Amino acid sequence: MKVAIIHDWLNGMRGGEKVLEAILELFPHATIYTLFHERGKVSPFIESHRIVASWLQSIPGVYRHYRNLLPLFPAAIESWDLREFDLVISSSHAVAKGVRAQGALHICYCHTPMRYVWDAEDDYALGALRHAAFRAVRPRLQRWDCEAAARVDHFIANSRFVQERIREYYGRSAEVVHPPIDTHYFTPPALNQREDFYLAAGALVSYKRFDIVVQAFNANHRRLVVAGDGPDLQRLRRMATRNIDVRGWVTSEELRRLYRTARGLVFAAREDFGMVAVEAQACGCPVIAYGAGGSLETVQDGVNGILFAEQHPDDVIRAIHRFELQAWPLEQVRFRTETFSRESFKTRIKKFVEERQNQNQERRGLRLQPA
């Protein structure tokens, strides 16, 4: 069986790329198709596969300014000839689901309907497309996105929150399979001795609202480490007072050490799932999170963290005060993390694909050869 995996772009190792790795473990001979591929920015495991980039790869400056090329993404994602493949799996938070599968069974693992065009154009770092140029093309991109969703045979959502967004924007049903967390790597320390600092971690983009976390810690004077890279890095450094270390990008080993030693993780995003929160919990680190989106599926108030109601510095400060009044036993913080394990993800994805393949074979009256 020939398998193609479509991924929006490859320019860093974030949550979507961790999902891609796990899917590739299930389909080790798959070919990856992507809008553009910045070599050396993803894991050696991903790099070891055959990777086909679109014609966007040849545009000068694409790695730095790709968000400004959003109106070109639909044409690029539709440009491949995939007739040789039996199964197409798209890993999509933008346009990957719009690939033309040309008769193959197409399953989309949807990280989110495209934020750029549906509900967060003012929150995401889109460069020049924030302004009139983007507003002019937005209705056309919304129409294309709905047409692209109709090409998908079956949707998988990464959370119940995204499942509802798929229903709202595309009128499609989806099965929920939460993203994979490496619970063999993200483990608690031998001695659970927390240090006197808080952690905020992830991609430093505006919709994740690191700014309100920094503002809260500017006001309450507690120590904060901000770990991650992205377009907001320098802005956050300018905002931060001396008690805040905006560290930038850290290795996975350093991130794990921070999870293992931080007093708590502060998570202010209205996130589709939020893998960072579960990684922290797996290391025994409780989470102080905005009570919306995927956090409602991973943080149980008073058990493995604290939820706050508004994305405002004052709400963060009040949540930290509540947090500090409570003890956080290690096993209580970790009690659900194994349900998000990499093994659980792969088992559920494999079962979903096999069931849909069997249904497809029955409809066609054909029997596909196993890989």
Where are each of the predicted segments found?
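A charged, aromatic-enriched C-terminal amphipathic alpha-helix characteristic of glycosyltransferases
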Residues: 314, 325-367
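Conserved donor-binding/catalytic core segment of Leloir-type glycosyltransferases
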Residues: 187-225
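Acidic donor-binding loop of glycosyltransferase active sites
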Residues: 260-272, 285
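Membrane-proximal helix-turn-helix segments that form the acceptor-binding/catalytic region
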Residues: 126-155, 163-164
